[in-house]
Structures are given as structure tokens and as C-alpha cells.
């Protein structure tokens, strides 16, 4: 399913989910509208009832090219595509005559609390990019704590951006963590800098020069979990993010695609009616996205 003429004033986000964590799309580049965890409720908002809690927005990002921040006003050929067969969502656009950009995000099927965003930049001229991964807490959460660590293994050192917060009544501890995954290794990786804007938002960023014709790719992997699922969500969310980093982008996507190939073995085919076929595929896609074997959640 494709959308080539995106109107922010008439936009309803589509969800990419794995039965546990869901990502709702946004009409703005490098933004996701919401991140939702199944089974995560607390009393807030309208009425004295428990409502779904929005988790940390761990896939928001920004991109600057030659010092100019990318936004919906300075790009062209903006297109969004939902791949229902492999449950991913791709956004692509051009930035003047300087670069073509695309990114694809996944709620990884094999890792119920982990998401991935794979970003690709094709330089049309010599440019300098600054890319940031932004961790932002929804307004409903309280007592937000932000952390930044550099994790050292035998072969590399990599950044870990982490946040925790209490749910509105203090019933739950909510945690999220993410990291960059670079194709460069060791000392060749870009230098990552951490900045804290306020108690609800912090980010990590890097800067890199690209030559005309060069295609540069990197990824953001992150996890989110609460005390409703694990007794020690802070430790668990960092462990899951480190695991995703060590797996690498290719293995993460290959296992995700394989899991969705297995789900689509239960397909329904309608011949001679393309609209009905698309409707059926949409229903099956959302069914498979919102349920998960063994979770008792929907």
C-alpha cells in the first residue's frame, strides 16, 4: 500500500506491530506518532478507568544536511509505503539536489519488545550530515530519568540511550533504550555525542561527511518494556537492545522476514477482484500484527 500525496491535515497513521509493541506512523519525516506496548495500562485521562499507556517514543530522529534540519517543508517526492507481507513501513523523499533519503522501520517479530529503523542516504553532492536518535517521554509519564552509557565489548564500544519513568499513578515502571548500528567497525565508527534538552527528552547524534554518489546507511535499534512484563525492566530493556546491536541489521531483518513468511502461509487468495484481495490482506495483516502466540493479549 502506497501514499504519494500525504496530507498532514487528513492523515490517519498506520501501525506496524508484532503482537506486543506497535509503532504508529506520522506524516512528518523521521517521526513516529506513538509507540504502544500491549498489556500496559494505568488510570489517567478521561474517566476513572485504566487506559492504554503510550510508551517512550524511541524511534523519533532528526537529520540535518549541511546544517539544515529536514522537515516536511523543505523536501519533495515524499512517499510512504506499507509492506504488509513483511510488516515494515518505508518513507522516502528528496532533499533538493543534495540527497535522496529513505528509512524503514520494523516491530521485530522474533523479538517482541524490540524495534528497528534502517536509514539510507544517497548523496547527490558533497554534503555533511548530522543524524540524531531522540528519546522522548509522553506527557502522561512522571519522574522521568535519562541515562547515557557507552558499552564496551571485546571488539567495539557502542552508545546506549536509556530512559525510565513511572506511569501516571506510579503503578508501573516504564523503560526504553536504543542504540545506533553502524556498518563501520571499531575506530571507524562515527563519534556519537549525547545531549540532554530537558527531563522529558534527550538524544544522541553523530556527524559524517559524504561524497557525491556515496550511499550511507545506518540503523537505530531500540527496546521498550515495563514492570507489567518484567520485574526488572531497566536491566531487561538494556539487555535486549545490546542483543539487537550484536545481532546486526541483516540478521534482525532476515529473522523478522522469515517469521512473517511463516505467518503468511495462512493466506486467503481471491482471484479477479483486486480491491477485495487488498481488503482481505489488510485484515489478515492487522490480525497478525495485533496478536501474538502465547501472550494472551490482543
Where are these regions (language model features)?
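Acidic/polar, glycine-enriched structural segments that form the non-catalytic walls/loops
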Residues: 1-16, 20-298
Amino acid at each position: 500500500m502506497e501514499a504519494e500525496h500525504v496530507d498532514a491535515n487528513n492523515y490517519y497513521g498506520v501501525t506496524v506491530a508484532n503482537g506486543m509493541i506497535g509503532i504508529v506512523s506520522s506524516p512528518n519525516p523521521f517521526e513516529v506518532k506513538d509507540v504502544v506496548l500491549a498489556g500496559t495500562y494505568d488510570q489517567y485521562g478521561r474517566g476513572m478507568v485504566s487506559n492504554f499507556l503510550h510508551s517512550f517514543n524511541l524511534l523519533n530522529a532528526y537529520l540535518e544536511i549541511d546544517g539544515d534540519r529536514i522537515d516536511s517543508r523543505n523536501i519533495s517526492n515524499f512517499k510512504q509505503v506499507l509492506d504488509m507481507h513483511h510488516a515494515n513501513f518505508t518513507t522516502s523523499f528528496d532533499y533538493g539536489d543534495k540527497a535522496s533519503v529513505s528509512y524503514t522501520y520494523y516491530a521485530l517479530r522474533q523479538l517482541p519488545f524490540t524495534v528497528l529503523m534502517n536509514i539510507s542516504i544517497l548523496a547527490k553532492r558533497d554534503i555533511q550530515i548530522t543524524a540524531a536518535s531522540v528519546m522522548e517521554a509522553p506527557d502522561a509519564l512522571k519522574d522521568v530519568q535519562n541515562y547515557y552509557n557507552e558499552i564496551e565489548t571485546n571488539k567495539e564500544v557502542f552508545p546506549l540511550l536509556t530512559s525510565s519513568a513511572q506511569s501516571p499513578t506510579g503503578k508501573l515502571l516504564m523503560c526504553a533504550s536504543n542504540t545506533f548500528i553502524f556498518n563501520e567497525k571499531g575506530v571507524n565508527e562515527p563519534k556519537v555525542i549525547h545531549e540532554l534538552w530537558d527531563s522529558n527528552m534527550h538524544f544522541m547524534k553523530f556527524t559524517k561527511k559524504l561524497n557525491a554518489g556515496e550511499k550511507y546507511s545506518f540503523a537505530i535499534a531500540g527496546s521498550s518494556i515495563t514492570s507489567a512484563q518484567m520485574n526488572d525492566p531497566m536491566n531487561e530493556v538494556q539487555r535486549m537492545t545490546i542483543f539487537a546491536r550484536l545481532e546486526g541489521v541483516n540478521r534482525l531483518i532476515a529473522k523478522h522476514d522469515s517469521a512473517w513468511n511463516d505467518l503468511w502461509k495462512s493466506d486467503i487468495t481471491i482471484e479477479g477482484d483486486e480491491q477485495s484481495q487488498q481488503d482481505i490482506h489488510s485484515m489478515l495483516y492487522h490480525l497478525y500484527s495485533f496478536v501474538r502466540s502465547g501472550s494472551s493479549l490482543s
